[in-house]
Amino acid sequence: MITYYENVMDVLRESVSSIPVEEYERLIGECVDALQNGGKIIASGLGKNVPICEKFVGTMNSMGLDARFLHTNTAVHGDLGMVMKNDIVLLLSKGGNTIETVTLANYLKERGTNTWLLTFSKNSKSAEIVDNKMELFLENEGDEWDIMPNNSTSVYLIILQGMAVEIGKRMGVQLEDFKVNHPGGGIGAKLRGENLWN
């Protein structure tokens, strides 16, 4: 069993190492620019990528930074209304060929929205549509069929959380900002110098 986890860590390490540095730095910069110009960062995904996007949004919001989740499926049923002029959209899709993802990519392009595709596929319909891409490598998903969203979602989580931390730094977020937004639970108590049960 331990061997399985060691193999997973090797896969994740190799995948994270495949992050294209130039594109990553440009993406971070454009996220910061969007926030500084009154825009917001929108993370969009479907299926098992939904909680990954929501975690990123939650981390951003806890720092007082404007981020929203846009479900790839419901976007074209009115939710596109949240996308404004100065926003940036992070579109998560492992294969990039899901009909909903391709459809949303097309509509975002028509609107002139700054869109980034975070994908593990270099050749996909979405990649043909979206100009800005961060293409990642993934050896396998870690299950016996190499089909379940497992390692890919872990990589997305690592990358998006890393992005949130870096964006927070560049936006000058201080611990006091986080403290104001997170008064509850053990974290809130710790920030107030209190014991949770006192």
What are these regions (language model features)?
Residues 1-37:
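An N-terminal, well-structured beta->alpha segment
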Residues 1-4, 19, 48, 151, ...:
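Catalytic cores of large soluble enzymes that bind and process phosphate-bearing ligands
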Residues 30, 49, 78, 181-182, ...:
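Residue-level signal for alpha-helical context at structural boundaries
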Residues 39-171:
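Glycine-rich phosphate-binding loops that contact phosphosugars or nucleotide phosphates
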Residues 128, 142-143, 168-198:
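Internal, active-site/partner-interface "lid" segment
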